[in-house]
Each structure stands twice: as C-alpha cells, then as structure tokens.
Amino acid sequence: GVVDILKGAAKDIAGHLASKVMNKL
C-alpha cells in the first residue's frame, strides 16, 4: 500500500543520510 511505499522511501532516505554522515566522520 501507500504507507508501505512511504515507509520504504523513508528507510532509503535515512540510509543515504546515514551513509553521508559516516563518510564525513
């Protein structure tokens, strides 16, 4: 459903942001 899609997108975005932060450290 739409909620599942939004949850998946949120996880992907969070993963990308986490990767960027880890790369800066």
Curated annotation (Swiss-Prot):
The modification Leucine amide is found at L25. It comes from the Eukaryota. Transmembrane segments: none annotated. GO terms for biological process: defense response to bacterium; defense response to fungus; regulation of defense response to virus; symbiont-mediated hemolysis of host erythrocyte. Keywords: Amidation, Amphibian defense peptide, Antibiotic, Antimicrobial, Antiviral protein, Fungicide, Secreted. The keyword Transcription regulation does not apply. It holds the Pfam family Antimicrobial15. Its main location: secreted. Expressed by the skin glands. One of its GO terms (cellular component) is extracellular region. It is found in: Secreted. Signal peptide: none annotated. Coiled coil: none annotated. Belongs to the frog skin active peptide (FSAP) family. Ocellatin subfamily. The primary structure of this peptide is identical to that of Ocellatin-F1 from Leptodactylus labyrinthicus (AC C0HKF0). The cross-references to PDB can be found in this entry (AC C0HKF0). This is Ocellatin-F1.
